[in-house]
From Swiss-Prot:
Function: Participates actively in the response to hyperosmotic and heat shock by preventing the aggregation of stress-denatured proteins and by disaggregating proteins, also in an autonomous, DnaK-independent fashion. Unfolded proteins bind initially to DnaJ; upon interaction with the DnaJ-bound protein, DnaK hydrolyzes its bound ATP, resulting in the formation of a stable complex. GrpE releases ADP from DnaK; ATP binding to DnaK triggers the release of the substrate protein, thus completing the reaction cycle.
UniProt domain comment: The J domain is necessary and sufficient to stimulate DnaK ATPase activity. Zinc center 1 plays an important role in the autonomous, DnaK-independent chaperone activity of DnaJ. Zinc center 2 is essential for interaction with DnaK and for DnaJ activity.
Any one Gene Ontology BP term: protein refolding
Domain J: 5-70
Alphabetized PANTHER family for the sequence: CHAPERONE PROTEIN DNAJ (PTHR43096:SF48), DNAJ HOMOLOG 1, MITOCHONDRIAL-RELATED (PTHR43096)
Residues where Zn(2+) 1 binds: C148, C151, C201, C204
Record-given protein name: Chaperone protein DnaJ
Amino acid sequence: MSKRDFYEVLGVSKGADEREIKKAYKPLAMKFHPDRNQGDAASEEKFKEVKEAYEILTDENLRARYDQYGHAGVDQSQGGGGHGGFGGGADFGDAFGDIFGDIFGGRNGGGRRGPARGSDLRYTMELTLEEAVRGVSKEIKVPSLVHCEVCNGSGAHTGSTAQTCPTCHGAGQVQMRQGFFAVQQACPHCHGRGKIIKDPCRKCHGEGRYQKTKTLSVKIPAGVDTGDRIRLSGEGEAGEAGAPAGDLYVQVHVKEHEIFVRDGNNLYCEVPISFTAAALGGEIEVPTLDGRVKLKVTPETQTGKMFRMRGKGVKSVRSGQVGDLMCKVVIETPVKLTESQKELLRQLDESFSGAAAKTHKPRSEGFFEGVKRFFDDLTR
């Protein structure tokens, strides 16, 4: 099945910068996240599609490949990990190497030149809003290929050594003639390594590395948000025959909070207040991530009014600036009234009628006057 355009998936233009891409990604990731759509296979596929698009378009190198070659330029780079939520990285040549390898009889038309660097891995870490705002250290378990400590990555059994390949004489490549062309390809005898292991290591079976789930401690800085990525250098898969290891990229996903909604460095919440507090004003308690604080409500406050509490938001992980907490007032209508309470409200409402209506209820009176004028105009 053909893939959708990554820019279309996120709903951004091809000229979108990283900030715009991140802003588009967050609501989509929250909408289709498996935790919110348990058992919904369609939403899970959508989440994977959105996540893949974000990872490609926020990686400068991968985005350049995608812009030039489309999906063919990045599909191989994202594949090869095969460890649950992980994906391995690969050199750009690998995206097309198999095509030429099939034609000329080898894995890559140009042949492999020495041991390959280990693949990069990806891990998605879920955080609560509190953990993201304050920072946290967490242990994660990562399935990976690790360096064999028994043979020290050589692949040879203790007491033996790898022998120079008699076919390519250690070059890792052989020259093959295809009609008029002489083509370099990976040596089929040693698979491009230049060495032959006759007595392989019992632990890694001659590979120099083996599969293991390793435990890592990851320090998450304060202020991270959904879409942020943390690179752990050298914590990816071990390289072949002592080549450098790849990197591990920890992708942050912040779970929804029951009270607060985050937008950049600002936090938003709704605060219910009684209609008497709204009319007369006073102090109310509002929640913050540091505990409850007092908020002064001005008299005659209308529902929907926003109060700003400076410095009660999130400290930026990049600039160090602290955002604000925006409290939206929602006036609560009293319920389950007694007869005496209903009578008091009727008396109060009557006191607002007549000539006093415009003074005490300017918005509603203005609205109904506007409605009356509208219908009067229709009947003329």
